[in-house]
Design a protein with these regions (language model features):
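Short, Lys/Arg-rich, polar N-terminal cytosolic tail immediately upstream
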Residues: 1-4
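A structural signal for multi-pass alpha-helical bundles of membrane permease subunits
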Residues: 6-270
Length: 270
């Protein structure tokens, strides 16, 4: 009986958390299908005539397509480089006697301490001096600082929890340090490491402040383009804003689904 109550409480708490997390997205989807008059009514309307005009207005804007392409290129490159550099670095910190290990970990964590407002002006000055302002390269390097620190920090405890006996057994079979990492540690920890990669992707995909400061038109990301819809005319186009929010949330969901399927196929293949 006690176990049933405990399980029921866990399910209830999990359901409540899921409801709180999904409610904003559900509300955005609902409002994106409404006319403006249905959105601004004092009493929320759940019965209305749906319309796709908001999505048509968003998708008909060439800036949205350019922003989507910029976001995919910039975020994809920064996350891929962050994972390629951060995961091996985390394994080295977790498994080998690296000098200044604690200082390195504190430095990685300190990169998340500073708010974007504090570093926006120095970053603008640096990229303007280098002639790289409003370029994809400057955004990739800037976001790489976020993804690299996040993935490395989250991956260190994952490798520390890996039993050393597994690696020692592989070493006895003739595996070198690199082979132990690529063929043993990485496949075993892949499911957990995926969480850090997805988290860093969501962080930089939704980032607005730095993108707003470091881009103007050529390299503007999708959040920057979506924020411009708030200044269309004298009335706030809530339907268009909600439609752009829904479209902004779709790529991370697709990314998570594709990465999960790829990981599952790799695990089954082994």
């Amino acid at each position: 009986m006690g176990r049933l109550i405990s399980r029921g409480g866990t399910v209830a708490i999990g359901g409540l958390i899921l409801l709180v997390a999904a409610l904003p997205l559900f509300w955005a989807v609902l409002n994106s299908l409404k006319h403006l008059l249905d959105i601004v009514t004092p009493t929320p309307r759940f019965l209305f005539v749906p319309t796709l005009a908001n999505y048509r207005q968003v998708l008909s804007s060439p800036e949205v397509m350019i922003g989507l392409g910029n976001s995919i290129a910039i975020v994809g490159a920064s996350v891929a480089l962050g994972a390629l550099l951060g995961v091996p670095a985390a394994y080295a910190i977790a498994r080998y006697p690296v000098r200044g290990k604690r200082d390195i970990q504190f430095f990685l964590l300190s990169l998340r301490f500073l708010p974007p407002v504090a570093i926006a002006v120095p970053l603008i000055a640096i990229w303007v001096d280098l002639g790289l302002y409003d370029t994809k390269l400057s955004m990739i390097v800037t976001y790489l600082l976020v993804t690299l620190s996040t993935i490395t920090w989250l991956s260190i405890p994952v490798f520390r929890r890996l039993p050393r006996e597994i690696e020692e057994a592989a070493a006895l079979d003739g595996y070198g340090p690199y082979a132990v990492f690529w063929h043993i540690a990485l496949p075993v920890c892949a499911n957990t490491l995926l969480g850090g990669v997805v988290f860093s992707f969501v962080l930089v995909w939704n980032e607005l402040m730095i993108a707003l400061a470091l881009t103007s038109s050529r390299s503007a990301t999708l959040p920057v383009v979506a924020s411009a819809f708030t200044s269309l005319g004298q009335e706030v186009p809530w339907g268009v804003i909600n439609a752009s929010t829904v479209l902004l949330a779709l790529p991370p969901l697709v990314f998570v689904g594709m990465l999960s399927r790829l990981l599952n196929s790799m695990v089954k293949g082994k």
